[in-house]
Design a protein with these regions (language model features):
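Extracytoplasmic
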Residues: 18-19, 25-44
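Central cavity-lining transmembrane alpha-helices of secondary-active solute carriers
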Residues: 60-76
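C-terminal ends and interior cores of transmembrane alpha-helices
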Residues: 93-118
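Hydrophobic core of transmembrane alpha-helices in multi-pass small-molecule transporters
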Residues: 113-138
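Cytoplasmic helix-loop-helix junction between adjacent transmembrane helices
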Residues: 131-166
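Glycine-rich segments within core transmembrane alpha-helices of 12-TM secondary carriers
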Residues: 162-176
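Conserved small/polar residues in nucleotide/adenosyl-binding loops
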Residues: 191-198
Length: 202
């Protein structure tokens, strides 16, 4: 009965392409947030007094858990055992939590000289958030692939995968084009407290 219902749902072109639009938009947001800090590097150096070592440490965090803790492999196992709904929701929650931690780190002024694991506390917390986000977005990527395989068959499958990847990469383009204008419009990096530069000048 369940398989029959799934087959009926798959037969609906409207539902198939709506599902594709939903998962493609999710990955667009994921790719946008993956690359959103890259155009802000000069602003991070100017406003938060980051240096290239800090920024390099931060960007390396994306692969910490995925590479050294084999989270993509575990994510695939969870996907096979628990299904796309559980894994997809879990991946999105990791993305949201990671982004929230990164935003907290960037928007909070920590005491000057505060260090954590050899780096500024702000940098370390932002990197940790980025690492958690990286797990979420990569697991979301493999979940999306399985969703497409479930909903599309034959010649439509390759087209669906191509459209999903193309849409996701629009997120990277939007990050490069919109991030700096948005930061300028909202006032630097949406600070809720004075930046280290302002504190140093006062």
């Amino acid at each position: 009965m369940t398989e029959h219902l799934k087959q009926k749902l798959n037969d609906s072109a409207v539902l198939r392409w709506s599902v594709l639009a939903l998962v493609a938009f999710t990955m667009l947001c994921g790719y946008f947030l993956t690359d959103v800090m890259s155009p802000l590097k000069p602003m991070l150096e100017k406003e938060l007094l980051w240096d290239s070592l800090d920024y390099g440490f931060f960007t390396s965090a994306y692969g910490w858990f995925n590479v050294f803790l084999l989270m993509l492999i575990f994510g695939g196992i969870i996907l096979d055992k628990m299904g796309v709904r559980f894994t997809g929701i879990g991946a999105c929650l990791l993305m949201v939590f990671g982004c929230g931690l990164k935003y907290y780190a960037i928007s909070t002024t920590f005491p000057e000289g505060a260090m954590l694991f050899g780096f500024k506390t702000q940098v370390t917390l932002a990197a940790l958030g980025y690492a958690i986000f990286g797990v979420g977005v990569e697991i979301a990527g493999i979940t999306v692939s399985k969703i497409i395989v479930k909903w599309f068959k034959g010649k439509e499958m390759a087209l669906a995968m191509g459209l999903e990847m193309a849409t996701a990469r629009i997120g990277t383009t939007l990050a490069m084009v919109l991030t700096v204008p948005l930061a300028d419009f909202f006032g630097c990096l949406l600070y809720t407290s004075p930046s280290p530069r302002d504190q140093r000048g006062s």
